[in-house]
């Protein structure tokens, strides 16, 4: 019996020697390696989530703006089309780049498509605007369908008057084209005003055309265009209707403002993390979208904005949007897939952009910024 016991001891010692020295810290190192591996996996997961979020944003913007593809407008074309006018400069200069704040309330329940606030429409030529001498007259405006279904708050016609060398009085007249009358009349007056100009640079002048626009929207067939005249005391026309050399961006244009209906908001809470965070739970991470990196020159402003994204694990009862989510899992743990880390609070961004018809639109795109993340 003793011999058998000694034999077992020898065999055990031989196995220990064959296995090599025993490291007392081996268990802790293994746990540390597992932890590091988990962190690496979390980083890779977040990287994939970032990429997916950016691709989703590109698709959402085109869809919400009702664009099948990104407008193909070159930088040279943009430089020619972009008016050097006060209302547009004001939008760009005072543009409120999307802030990453944590204010109470948000547009959680929001319409899918963009809400238009301001539309800047450039003139186009029309066959009807032809005089007997064959010279086209400005201007004919085609209106976006967005104006048709929104209440017009303001409509301004902006015209640029060339500089003068001496003080002069300018008589501005806006005429609306109509179908030829029996007496040959083809125009009816819209607005007329008198301006005193001093030597120096040219000036932009705005004219209220809200009533005319509303009539055009009610009776589209009556929209045959307008003619602009701005004559000085010597009979010289100072209005830029067809820009010449060095007059890019001085075309006449219409600035139309429409109503925007605010929606109710609700509060929510969640975790905020940075890219170096070791937080494994559902959290909001920063993400800046750069439109110039996409080659999307058709977006005038903002050139970039903070979109953010959600990533992390969802333990049951942690940041769940709906209380019943936990109860459903408890009742049927195998039949429930469990909660996922998703945005629970989002807010819109304002955007100034060219649409497919080369019109400049200033509108609000809903649900483009992740403000809070949670499990649902």
Swiss-Prot record:
The record marks 99-100 as: Cleavage. Residues 25-267 form a propeptide. Keywords: Cleavage on pair of basic residues, Cytokine, Disulfide bond, Glycoprotein, Growth factor, Heparin-binding, Secreted, Signal. SMART domains: TGFB. Glycans are attached at residue 72. It holds the Pfam family TGFb_propeptide. Expressed specifically in developing and adult skeletal muscle. Weak expression in adipose tissue. Residues 1-24 form the signal peptide. PROSITE patterns: TGF_BETA_1, TGF_BETA_2. It is found in: Secreted. Disulfide bonds join 273-283, 282-341, 310-373, 314-375. One of its GO terms (biological process) is response to testosterone. Gene3D superfamilies: 2.60.120.970, Cystine-knot cytokines. InterPro entries: Cystine-knot_cytokine, TGF-b_C, TGF-b_propeptide, TGF-beta-rel, TGFb_CS. Acts specifically as a negative regulator of skeletal muscle growth. Homodimer; disulfide-linked. Interacts with WFIKKN2, leading to inhibit its activity. Interacts with FSTL3. Belongs to the TGF-beta family. This is Growth/differentiation factor 8. It comes from Mus musculus (Mouse). The lineage of its organism: Eukaryota, Metazoa, Chordata, Craniata, Vertebrata. The gene is Mstn.
């Amino acid at each position: 019996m003793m011999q058998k016991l000694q034999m077992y001891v020898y065999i055990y010692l031989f196995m220990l020697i064959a296995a090599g020295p025993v490291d007392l810290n081996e268990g802790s190192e293994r746990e540390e390696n597992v932890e590091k591996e988990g962190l690496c996996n979390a980083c890779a997961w977040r990287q994939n989530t970032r990429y997916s979020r950016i691709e989703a944003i590109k698709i959402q913007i085109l869809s919400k703006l009702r664009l099948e593809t990104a407008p193909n407008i070159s930088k040279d074309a943009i430089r020619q089309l972009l008016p050097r006018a006060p209302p547009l400069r004001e939008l760009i200069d005072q543009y409120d780049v999307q802030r990453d704040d944590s204010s109470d309330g948000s547009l959680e329940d929001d319409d899918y498509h963009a809400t238009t606030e301001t539309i800047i429409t450039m003139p186009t030529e029309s066959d009807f605007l032809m005089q007997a001498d064959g010279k086209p007259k400005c201007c004919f405006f085609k209106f976006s369908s967005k104006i048709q279904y929104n209440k017009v708050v303001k409509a301004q016609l902006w015209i640029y008057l060339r500089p003068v060398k001496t003080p002069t009085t300018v008589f501005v007249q806006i005429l609306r084209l109509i179908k030829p009358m029996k007496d040959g009349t083809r125009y009816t007056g819209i607005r007329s005003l008198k301006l005193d100009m001093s030597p120096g640079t040219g000036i932009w002048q705005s004219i209220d055309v809200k009533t005319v626009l509303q009539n055009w929207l009610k009776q589209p067939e009556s929209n045959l265009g307008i003619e602009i005249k701005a004559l000085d005391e010597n009979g010289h026309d100072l209005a830029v209707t067809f820009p010449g050399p060095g007059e890019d961006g001085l075309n006449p244009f219409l600035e139309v403002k429409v109503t925007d209906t605010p929606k109710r908001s609700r509060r929510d809470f969640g975790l905020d993390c940075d890219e170096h965070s070791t937080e494994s739970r559902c959290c909001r991470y920063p993400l800046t979208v750069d439109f110039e990196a996409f080659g999307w020159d058709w977006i005038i402003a903002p050139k970039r904005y903070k979109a953010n994204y959600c990533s992390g694990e969802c333990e049951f009862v942690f940041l769940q949007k709906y209380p019943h989510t936990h109860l459903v899992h408890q009742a049927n743990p195998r039949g429930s897939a469990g909660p996922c880390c998703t945005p629970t609070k989002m807010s819109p961004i304002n955007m100034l952009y060219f649409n497919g018809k080369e019109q400049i639109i200033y509108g609000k795109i809903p649900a483009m910024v992740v403000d809070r993340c949670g499990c649902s």
